[in-house]
Amino acid sequence: MQTEKFDVVIAGAGPAGCAAAYMLSEKGLKIALVDKDTFPRDKICGDALGADVTKQFHLMSETLAANLQQFDTKIPSNGVRFITPKHRQLDIAFTKPEKVFGGGFVAKRIDFDNFFFSETAKQPDIFIFQNQKIVSVTNNQNKIIVQSASISFEASMLLVADGAHSFLNKKLTENVVEKDHFCAGVRQYYSNVKDFHPENHIELHFYKDILPGYLWIFPLPGNQANVGLG
């Protein structure tokens, strides 16, 4: 089995893992960013990102923030349209985009994650390992050994960012799913969806039969929409 030595191994190359890797780059550390999939890859998501996401990109790097502005598979969205069980409508606009680093937007998760992953992969000291599903982890004499089917990673630190179904969370902690405080959702993409708010407000529909859940309809580029129930 191939052995690779690093200062930090980051398990998961989604937004959390990429943010960690990006911020650790150029700090004199050798970083492994490991993911079980190959990018671009999809994740079930509502696809709406608030203005704070844009703000965090500015705090991380002005270059990263500028590249996000040029990322063209997104549409700006700076408000919410609520639909009540009695079909009444309420539109709430967020703070003006120019006051919050450019405001929020909606982008398919497959596109946004691939953008962030690609930007992170350009940074120095970051070594990318795709299609490497982690199968074991041990803490051995001041070093952590993380193994996939073909590679053994040795590191001083392991950052766990492997998502909602985290193998490492189950392996390293006693955390369990609290069924009384757990929710799930379904999502589908639709084409030729029209008549959104002129400023692309996301829509949250609350219907008696599904409370406390709700239906969401979020606009996407090209007259597409992310429609889900959660």
Residue map of PLM features:
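Beta1/beta-strand and adjacent pyrophosphate-binding region of the FAD-binding site
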Residues: 2-16, 32
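Short, well-ordered alpha-helix to beta-strand connector turns
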Residues: 6, 28, 155-156
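Conserved Rossmann-like nucleotide-cofactor binding loop
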Residues: 16, 39, 165
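Residues forming the Rossmann-fold NAD(P)(H) cofactor-binding site
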Residues: 18, 114
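Rossmann-fold NAD(P)-dependent oxidoreductase module
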Residues: 23, 115, 119
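Glycine-rich FAD pyrophosphate-binding loop
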Residues: 25-45
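A conserved beta-strand/loop capping segment in the N-terminal third of enzymes
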Residues: 58-112
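Predominantly flavin-linked oxidoreductase catalytic cores and closely associated redox partners
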Residues: 119-230
